[in-house]
Amino acid sequence: RSTLFPTRRSSDLEYVTTYMVPLQAVAQTEGIVVKDEAEYVDFLVSRIGSKKIRNICYFEVNDCNPLNAIEYILEDGQPFFDAVVLFAGNINWDASKQKVYMKANPNVQALLDNSEELLQPLRKKGIKVLLDILGNHDQAGIAGLSDWGCEQFGKELAQICLDYKLDGIGFDDEYSSYYGSGKWFAGPSSQQAARLCYETKKAMKELCPWETWVHLYYLGYIQSSLPSVFIDGVEHKPSEFIDNVCADYGGSARPVNGMGLSGCAGNSIQLNYGYSISSSGAKALMNQGYGWIMWFAFDPSGTGTVNNNRSHSLRQFRNVAEGCYEQSVRDPKNVYNKISEGQYDPAPHPIN
């Protein structure tokens, strides 16, 4: 029981705020005794978002500071973005050490090394933060690792999520040469792409004490037709180890086996190319059952090599908010800048 907030309703609670409610356990049944150390409990409560369709944004981190996501808020206080994907880390082959590893360029590494000030503010607002992994012009690739190689690389990615407090991994099958030799490699196939997803999800669940996702960008061997993975004769459908998927620019993603449309992005909108969406189009996607809209290359600052696309992007965000949530997006007050290679400014700067 608690007498601190006797009339507080769930609708009174703010989004992205955690409330602590002190509770006292009182035994109502004769013969039942509550131990002193168990009598008082602090119960944490937060308001769950009401969106039927959510927003996932790929940030080109070579150009843009991902902290910009926190400035875009619905009128009811919910963040407009539900997940951010850091684009991107790479899967690479280290010839000297004879191993596959995750290579981070100076920008990705700076975000990871400064996670507390550059990434954790997003998570504290209820926005998931994922690291995307794609090929980098050598024999290592998302779809070309042996079963053993998938297990080893999956464990490395899970450790990265734990060390830097990330919410999962995205996979994007681009720019790999494939056809390496040795114990790390297998011929590229959708089967091996599925196995890497399986091993990564398994390792994250074992290592991270929070919910983690495997997210897919459909390209190359990564498609909706990914097969099941069989371990010791037990079938694991893709829906068991893949949480959400998106298509390439302008497309609608089809679900992997066992997944519904709620795990799929109904549109992939490249903001730097001027892609757009209407309020009626967004509502139609929601009514069809799609659970996500993907945004790519949002950059409200223009402090990298990409021009500021804030005005165009905000119009599209508001179209989605009006069509799907029957409200608008508040005017953003600040912008977060990228300073130079490997440097991001954690401080907000007022929009002129």
Where are the model-predicted features located?
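Generic N-terminal initiation segments characterized by hydrophobic and/or small/turn-forming residues
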Residues: R1-S2, M20
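Short, small-residue-biased leader/transition segments that mark boundaries at the very start
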Residues: T3-S10
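Secreted glycan hydrolases and related glycan-binding modules that recognize and/or cleave
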Residues: S11-N352
